[in-house]
């Protein structure tokens, strides 16, 4: 048996751009991807804090240090510039692996610069 567990997330990122005419995906600043251990073309789930929408797409790397969070193609219908989003990535673990697993949580400022990185998530203890 394998369990689907949170691998990592980028918390409260600000959408900088939404490009309906691009082929698809979400463009994420390479620095944020690296800190969150998210790979290019990896599947992610995105929760829009402003409107409650949740959707899935894949990641393409944006310029390191640019702060870019851009929803492309159909995903651009799910958020607009200025919206806050949570970008989550999951992994499949055995129960034994899951018992020791700690997700990487990357917190960002309004300009999508990194403010804090943790390796656990408990209600009321991080932020």
Curated annotation (Swiss-Prot):
Compartment annotation: Cytoplasm
UniProt xrefs under NCBIfam families: panD (TIGR00223)
Disulfide bridge partners, by residue number: none
The enzyme's E.C. designation: 4.1.1.11
Pathway named in the protein's UniProt entry: Cofactor biosynthesis; (R)-pantothenate biosynthesis; beta-alanine from L-aspartate: step 1/1
Keywords linked to the UniProt accession: Autocatalytic cleavage, Cytoplasm, Decarboxylase, Lyase, Pantothenate biosynthesis, Pyruvate, Schiff base, Zymogen
UniProt cross-references to Pfam families, sorted A to Z: Asp_decarbox
Cofactor: pyruvate
Taxonomic lineage: Bacteria, Bacillati, Bacillota, Clostridia, Eubacteriales
GO biological process: alanine biosynthetic process; pantothenate biosynthetic process
Residues at which substrate binds: 57, 73-75
Active site: 25, 58
Assembly information from the UniProt record: Heterooctamer of four alpha and four beta subunits.
Organism superkingdom: Bacteria
GO molecular function: aspartate 1-decarboxylase activity
PTM entry text: Is synthesized initially as an inactive proenzyme, which is activated by self-cleavage at a specific serine bond to produce a beta-subunit with a hydroxyl group at its C-terminus and an alpha-subunit with a pyruvoyl group at its N-terminus.
Stated family: Belongs to the PanD family.
Gene Ontology CC entries for this record: cytosol
Protein name, entry field: Aspartate 1-decarboxylase
HAMAP family per record: PanD
């Amino acid at each position: 048996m394998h369990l689907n567990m949170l691998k990592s997330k980028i918390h409260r990122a600000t959408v900088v751009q939404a490009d309906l005419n691009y082929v698809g995906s979400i463009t994420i600043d390479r620095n944020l991807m690296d800190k969150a251990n998210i790979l290019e073309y990896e599947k992610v789930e995105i929760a829009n804090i402003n409107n409650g929408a949740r959707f899935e797409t894949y990641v393409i790397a944006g310029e390191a240090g640019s702060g870019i969070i851009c929803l492309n193609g159909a995903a651009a219908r799910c958020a607009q510039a200025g919206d806050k989003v949570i970008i989550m990535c999951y992994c499949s673990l055995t129960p034994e692996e899951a018992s020791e697993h700690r997700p990487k949580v990357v917190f960002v400022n309004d300009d999508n610069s990194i403010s804090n990185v943790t390796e656990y998530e408990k209600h009321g203890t991080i932020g």
